[in-house]
A protein has these predicted regions:
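Rossmann-fold cofactor-recognition segment
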Residues: 196-216, 305-310, 317-318, 354, ...
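Canonical Rossmann dinucleotide-binding motif of NAD(H)/NADP(H)-dependent dehydrogenases/reductases
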Residues: 140-185
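Conserved glycine-rich Rossmann-like NAD(P)H-binding loop of the short-chain dehydrogenase/reductase
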Residues: 174-192, 206, 234-237, 244-273
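C-terminal helical subdomain
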Residues: 279-333, 464-511
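Conserved Rossmann-fold SDR core element
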Residues: 204, 231, 435-450, 494-502
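A glycine-rich helix->loop->beta "capping" turn
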Residues: 202-205, 224-237
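Active-site helix of classical SDR
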Residues: 381, 423
């Protein structure tokens, strides 16, 4: 059985051996059996045979490697991006003043390849643990860049959390009026109402409930935007379904979502006024409007008598289960009250669709992914481009949030999640096909890869990767948001707009 030997044990051993060397007579006072055992142990330690010598060489190399790994792990832990992840609730790190950035940065014992440029580096950036200094400086500056978007109107989907949440804040803090959609409008409004600078932009944020899986509701939403706004400058198709979550994943949100909007906190109510107006207008147009209030007690279904179920009951639609969800033990895989750093339900399922291959994926999930990631963005671009074309300012943008999964020009393609790959490839083709025509009207359309922000693997596998490899995604959600916003912000600031490009790490790559 292995034993951890302390420094005191080693010092006592050395002192004993030195004592016997100084007074060899003491050796012969020992019982013969003990003396022979001592000589064998000392000799084996100082004069190992060939096999023992080889074993020690291997052990020595392993010990050196362990020390290098431990030192590098400690060094990476000091970077800003990793320090921010230690908090129970994610808070976007503030911009560090130049005087606060240490002149001397830590060096890695083992060289690594930069996440962005792939160059070998050992000098750690103060914020990023996966980038060389040059790429780290560029990426850090991009997190905090701004531009003047005063009087501009933006529509963004998937605005409630993570990348979409920070894109929305960047738009608001640059002066834009933002129409933000989400399936869970009450939760979204509560989140935004807690921002310190809420009073500076709250009158310019309009949150709407919208389930992009229900395309007739997306069409109705486009009608509303066409009637409500006489201009539209920015369209960001951010919402995406990567891993489908069963109804139990969203159950904790339903308490607030089922409340009448006038019973939510006052600051949250203010952000939902336009949504209320939209629903009232929708109700007045319904042929069954007189029965709408009576139908609130009925279960929500995809096929109801009133139009716009994806607007009226966007949150409730998340609670419609599929037959293949019945095998889940909801209380076990979605433990009540356990939320992650983004205040999302912890998901303890052993596997998810990110790990699945063709032949293992439910048809309904494949259809959902196409609706959210490709069909809804098509409808929004198709319909809202007419509003955008009313005035040619020469600096309007459509940004389709894509991913490397949708890229064709790769020599090797992993065989997992083909349904999400299909959807992102379709979104890329939409961008590639239509961008040139839109540019003639001063609308610049691009697709953007957000970078590796989230580990989509099941929780148990993600935990194992952390324990064994000290793995964390190289970027955070603010980096993802900055990448999405860059063609807009950098284009306005420099006057040079990307058009018809697939952007990764702020620069075009092959489709």
């Amino acid at each position: 059985m292995s034993k951890n030997i302390s420094n005191l044990d080693i010092e006592a051993c050395i002192a004993t051996l030195q004592y016997l060397l100084d007074d060899t007579n003491q050796l012969f006072e020992l019982p013969e059996e003990q003396r022979v055992a001592l000589f064998k142990a000392a000799g084996g330690l100082t004069r190992p045979n060939r096999d023992e010598f080889q074993r020690r060489r291997k052990d020595a190399k392993k010990a050196v490697k362990r020390k290098m790994i431990a030192k590098d792990t400690h060094a990476r832990k000091t970077t800003g991006i990793r320090s921010a992840r230690e908090a129970a609730l994610f808070v976007a790190p503030k911009l560090l003043a130049a005087s606060s950035i240490p002149d001397e940065t830590l060096e890695l014992e083992s060289p690594r390849n930069c996440y962005v440029c792939k160059a070998v580096y050992t000098k750690l950036h103060h914020f990023y643990d996966t980038m060389c200094t040059e790429c780290g400086d560029l990426n850090y500056a991009k997190r905090f860049q701004t531009t003047d978007l005063q009087d501009q109107v933006a529509v963004i989907t998937g605005s409630r959390l993570k990348i979409g949440y920070h894109i929305t804040l960047m738009l608001l803090r640059s002066g834009a009026t933002v129409v933000a959609t989400t399936r869970f409008p009450a939760d979204s409004a509560i989140r935004f109402s807690k921002e310190d600078d809420y009073n500076q932009w709250s009158d310019r944020l309009h949150i709407h409930g919208l389930d992009l899986r229900h395309i007739p509701s997306v069409e109705i939403f486009c009608n509303y935007i066409e009637q409500k706004y006489n201009r539209l400058d920015i369209l960001i198709n951010n919402a995406a379904q990567t891993v489908r979550r069963p109804s139990g994943f969203y159950f904790h949100l339903m308490e607030n979502e089922k409340l009448p909007i006038n019973e939510l906190p006052k600051l949250a109510q203010n952000l939902l006024k336009d949504h209320v107006s939209c629903l009232e207008e929708l109700s007045s147009l319904s042929v069954n409007s007189s029965n709408t209030s009576k139908n609130n007690s009925l279960p929500v279904t995809w096929h109801g008598p009133e139009p716009g179920i994806g607007l009226r009951n966007s949150a409730e639609l998340s609670q419609i289960p599929y037959s293949f969800d019945n095998t889940l033990q909801t209380a076990e895989v979605f433990p009540e009250g356990e939320l992650d750093a983004d205040l999302q339900q912890v998901d303890l399922r052993n596997t998810n669709s990110w790990r699945l291959k063709l032949g293992e994926i439910e048809t309904t999930e494949m259809v959902e992914v196409q609706l959210v990631n490709a069909v809804a963005p098509f409808v929004l671009c198709n319909r809202l481009s007419n509003v955008m074309m009313k005035e040619n300012t020469g600096k309007k943008h459509i940004i389709n949030v894509s991913a490397m999964e949708g890229k064709f020009h790769r020599f090797k393609k992993a065989d997992r999640h083909p349904h999400t790959n299909m959807a992102k490839a379709a979104l890329n083709m939409l961008t590639h096909t239509s961008a040139t025509t839109f540019a003639k009207s001063g609308i610049y359309m691009n697709a953007v890869d957000t970078g590796w922000v989230t580990d989509e693997d099941p929780a148990a596998l993600s935990k194992k990767k952390v324990e064994i490899h000290d793995f964390q995604p190289p970027l955070d959600i603010v980096d993802g948001a900055a990448r999405v916003m860059d063609p807009l912000i950098d284009g306005i600031n420099t006057g040079k707009h990307w058009c018809g490009k697939f952007l990764k790490d702020y620069f075009p790559i092959d489709w």
